[in-house]
């Protein structure tokens, strides 16, 4: 919600000054956004057109939430209670793309078997943000990835019954349960 509000409030000012608004600078946000850009540049170079669909996958993590990320997520949840209409913005993968409405996007909100990788994947807690950022980048680059571009981002849990059990457990967990306070974390060791 707040990123959408800030784009509406400051987007024109940023454009006029030549500035760029960068909201998400976490361990995942920039690598996924730049990873899609790098991949699409390579696909265009090799095939003359962009890939119409890209799937981002998290293989593993050994970091922790920053207090700022946790506070942003908590504030978003609190804002939803006061303004239920924000849910439409949060659920829209194109909410940061200046009014663009793209194609229906792949499901990323429940565990599933990724048949190409032959592994179970679970919802990645930052995917709702990262997906919006990637679609915004596409829009800001005049839809270099295409108007029909689809993206989803999930967390690899592993193959077989153990992978399915892990995917089910991750999808039912609360990522904010042990979150640090704003201004705290991640620790030096985990960075």
Cite the ranges covered by each PLM segment.
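C-terminal catalytic/substrate-binding lobe primarily of soluble NAD(P)-dependent oxidoreductases
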Residues: 15-18, 29-30, 41-191
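Rossmann-fold NAD(P)-binding glycine/threonine-rich loop
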Residues: 1-19
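Active-site nucleophile and cofactor-binding loops and adjacent substrate-binding regions
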Residues: 23-29
């Amino acid at each position: 919600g707040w990123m959408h509000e800030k784009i509406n409030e400051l987007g024109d000012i940023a454009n006029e000054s030549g500035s760029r608004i960068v909201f998400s600078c976490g361990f995942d946000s920039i690598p996924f956004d730049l990873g899609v850009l790098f991949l699409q540049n390579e696909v265009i170079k090799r095939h003359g057109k962009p890939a119409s669909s890209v799937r981002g996958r998290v293989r593993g993590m050994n970091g922790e939430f920053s207090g700022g990320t946790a506070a942003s997520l908590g504030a978003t949840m609190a804002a939803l209670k006061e303004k239920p209409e924000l849910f439409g913005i949060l659920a829209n993968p194109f909410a940061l793309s200046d009014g663009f409405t793209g194609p229906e996007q792949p499901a990323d909100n429940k565990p599933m078997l990724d048949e190409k990788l032959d592994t179970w994947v679970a919802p990645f807690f930052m995917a709702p943000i990262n997906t919006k950022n990637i679609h915004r980048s596409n829009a800001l680059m005049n839809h270099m990835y295409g108007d029909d571009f689809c993206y989803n981002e999930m967390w690899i849990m592993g193959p077989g019954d153990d992978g399915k059990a892990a995917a089910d457990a991750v999808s039912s967990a609360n990522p904010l349960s042990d979150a640090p306070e704003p201004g705290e974390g991640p620790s030096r060791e985990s960075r």
